[in-house]
């Protein structure tokens, strides 16, 4: 698969990161991460992407992205961990791990929420047993093509415009940079550079071979 060669793609993070990191980014109003660090992974290969990987991101406590009003003011520093290649969180019950090939596990103080794009499961703490699921929330989101056309016609931002999708993509690819550079990346999003790891520079601003410029 072409996605699994560094010369052409970004592996699982480059392929699925923007889909699954989208859920916490959208739900919690996240922007660019403060750091990215590989918790566990295979040996690095110069040409091919890792078949499995665990990456931990840190985000600021203040909502740096599109703030979600219901969350603003109480969200503390947040840690987000990415798993792929069959790796799953130890907190995930075995019966659910067997049924869910992919998803996002939100871990809170009173329970956990396992979510995908079409289903979710609430894992309650005993003290949280009386919680009632909210009614479906109204949403302005429409099909991809339709909201793109609406943005063109009305001039209003699309749900995944560059202001949102830029930091999201940045986060996904930063995990790859941390893996390839072999160090925790303290990230300067404004200047798109690693503050602490010179080895990361070549994976952030790459000089491509001649013959591929427009």
Where are these regions (language model features)?
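Predominantly a Rossmann-like dinucleotide-binding segment in NAD(P)-dependent oxidoreductases
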Residues: 1-38, 44-47, 55, 61-74, ...
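A structural signal for well-ordered alpha-helical segments within the folded catalytic domains
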Residues: 11-14, 18-25, 142-146, 163-173
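Short, contiguous acidic/charged loop-to-helix segments that flank catalytic cores in large enzymes
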Residues: 43-46, 95-97, 128-140, 152, ...
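C-terminal helix-rich "cap/oligomerization" subdomain common to oxidoreductases
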Residues: 47-48, 151-214
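Short beta-strand scaffold segments in enzyme catalytic cores
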Residues: 53-57, 104-106
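Short, glycine-/Ser/Thr-/acidic-enriched flexible segments
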Residues: 60-62, 86-87, 111-113, 118-121, ...
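Phosphate/diphosphate-binding loops
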Residues: 78-88, 95
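Aromatic-enriched alpha-helical interface/lid elements that frame and gate functional surfaces
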Residues: 103, 107-146
